[in-house]
Amino acid sequence: MQGSLISSEIAEPYAQALLSVAQSSGQLEAIGGEIKSLLELLENAPDLRAFIGNPVIKEEAKKAVLSQVMGSSANPYLTNFMMLLVDKRRIQFLEPVCQQYLTLARVLTNTVLAEVSSATELNDSQKQIVIDKVKTLTGANVVELKTKVDGSLIGGVVIKVGSQVFDASIRGQLQRLSLSLR
């Protein structure tokens, strides 16, 4: 818990700085898209995460690897920002900074992230129904969906938006029925 608090205190100002640059350059969405890709890469490449977070590895080596990972088509603001994190010895906070950037960008654009668990993969029309329902419930302009399949739900969906959970699953209905029969 303590590490998480320290991490968020460090991440917040860096994320705000990147957001400010993205806003002033009109690249809020472009940088956000690259950050999502970067977070996905870090999630799927634990060796890369360990490499950039290792304090023993020299900054120049980290910069070289990050430049190679980002490629020549990467947004220069994001690439320069990551090099700044290396220079300031804050690169180990890259993931929390990126997460905080996305959170701040969502607030700025009145966007909500809806984490949807369903028994089977949702098709496009089902996703649109969920998006419309979340917009109605939250008043958001835009809804980002993060979907995952959870076979234990039996049927239906569970939607998590921030700290709110909307359980429209068969498993949830059975649990509520079980509680009412006690």
Curated annotation (Swiss-Prot):
Disulfide bond positions: none
Protein's membrane topology: Peripheral membrane protein
A single Gene Ontology CC term: plasma membrane-derived thylakoid membrane
Main localisation: membrane
MF terms in GO: proton-transporting ATP synthase activity, rotational mechanism
Pfam family name, one: OSCP
Subcellular location: Cellular thylakoid membrane
Entry keywords, A to Z: ATP synthesis, CF(1), Hydrogen ion transport, Ion transport, Membrane, Thylakoid, Transport
Record bears the keyword Thylakoid: yes
Subunit structure: F-type ATPases have 2 components, F(1) - the catalytic core - and F(0) - the membrane proton channel. F(1) has five subunits: alpha(3), beta(3), gamma(1), delta(1), epsilon(1). CF(0) has four main subunits: a(1), b(1), b'(1) and c(10-14). The alpha and beta chains form an alternating ring which encloses part of the gamma chain. F(1) is attached to F(0) by a central stalk formed by the gamma and epsilon chains, while a peripheral stalk is formed by the delta, b and b' chains.
Family: Belongs to the ATPase delta chain family.
PANTHER family for this protein: ATP SYNTHASE DELTA CHAIN
Cited HAMAP family: ATP_synth_delta_bact
Record function comment: F(1)F(0) ATP synthase produces ATP from ADP in the presence of a proton or sodium gradient. F-type ATPases consist of two structural domains, F(1) containing the extramembraneous catalytic core and F(0) containing the membrane proton channel, linked together by a central stalk and a peripheral stalk. During catalysis, ATP synthesis in the catalytic domain of F(1) is coupled via a rotary mechanism of the central stalk subunits to proton translocation.
NCBIfam families from the UniProt entry: ATP_synt_delta
Protein's name according to its UniProt entry: ATP synthase subunit delta
Organism: Microcystis aeruginosa (strain NIES-843 / IAM M-2473)
Source taxonomy: Bacteria, Bacillati, Cyanobacteriota, Cyanophyceae, Oscillatoriophycideae
